[in-house]
Amino acid sequence: MTDSIPHIPVLVKESLSLFRDRNPVVFCDVTVGAGGHAEAFLTEFPSIERYDGSDRDLSALALSENRLLPFKDRVRLRHASFEEVDTLTSDGTYDGVLADLGVSSMQLNNLERGFSFQGEDHPLDMRMDTSRGMTASEVLNSLREEEIGEIFRNYGEEPLWRSAAAAVVHFRKKKKILTVKDLKDATSGVFPSYRLRKKIHPLTLIFQALRIYVNQEGAQLKVLLDSAFRWLRPGGRLAVISFCSLDDRPVKWAFREAEARGLGKILTKKVIMPSYEETRMNPRSRSAKLRCFEKSFEDK
């Protein structure tokens, strides 16, 4: 499979509604991906004169560039992490900032990227930015058992993290873990029968943990939440879509802390989730949560 498989953006209507009374002029999308949200925002808001879209995934940026050709005079795309976006951004630049966290359908469907446990013979890569950093395979073959266990526990919240880490280290003594199938084989005896009978694949949490570690998603999210409030103009809004509690919790806490400090107010007192219709059409949207914060109109 290739990167041409389309990604279905989630909570698009709900995201647009959070900015409809603002008519943003300068907007930042720090996870532009294949350009789904960007296309919707640029269509909905003719007021947007500059749309800065960034992503760590070069293949996604190529798709986004093609998709956003009708808006090319209003779009500026950048290959950048959240940290790199921060170094490029002056305080008080944006009317709105959007972040759509996690892995995209496009990345999951491209089995060559190693994000999905369906790609038996494909390499365990899992890097958003394939130009830098350790692959998931390198992590599993080089780190100590205790370190691998901590990854499974801290980033996957996998109950059987000790057993899974021990199984990985035992397997790699005989054969390097290079492919998805190798990881499946390494952990084949870890999960009890009731986990195997569930709809959710038993390796889901292990794959989540490896992806988060490989891409340093926790550290990147911290950079975003420490920086994005500064990027906003007075009255500007930060909207964040998350797909797991490890992402949603820090967003919720950061918004609460910012509100307590008088930096602005939380607009989503009740977190926004996909409608039944959206989850039916796009099952991968079922865990999505959208939160939004509005910066105060007065400088603090």
Curated annotation (Swiss-Prot):
Keywords, sorted A to Z: Cytoplasm, Methyltransferase, rRNA processing, S-adenosyl-L-methionine, Transferase
Main location group: cytoplasm
GO cellular component: cytoplasm
Catalytic activity: cytidine(1402) in 16S rRNA + S-adenosyl-L-methionine = N(4)-methylcytidine(1402) in 16S rRNA + S-adenosyl-L-homocysteine + H(+)
Tree of life domain: Bacteria
Residues the record lists as binding S-adenosyl-L-methionine: 35-37, 55, 82, 100, 107
Cell location: Cytoplasm
Keyword S-adenosyl-L-methionine assigned: yes
Transmembrane domains' residue ranges: none
Keyword Cytoplasm included in the entry's annotation: yes
Enzyme Commission code(s) on record: 2.1.1.199
GO BP annotations, alphabetical order: rRNA base methylation
Molecular functions (GO terms): rRNA (cytosine-N4-)-methyltransferase activity
PANTHER family registered for this protein in UniProt: 12S RRNA N4-METHYLCYTIDINE METHYLTRANSFERASE, S-ADENOSYL-METHYLTRANSFERASE MRAW
Function of the molecule: Specifically methylates the N4 position of cytidine in position 1402 (C1402) of 16S rRNA.
Entry similarity comment: Belongs to the methyltransferase superfamily. RsmH family.
Name the UniProt record assigns to this protein: Ribosomal RNA small subunit methyltransferase H
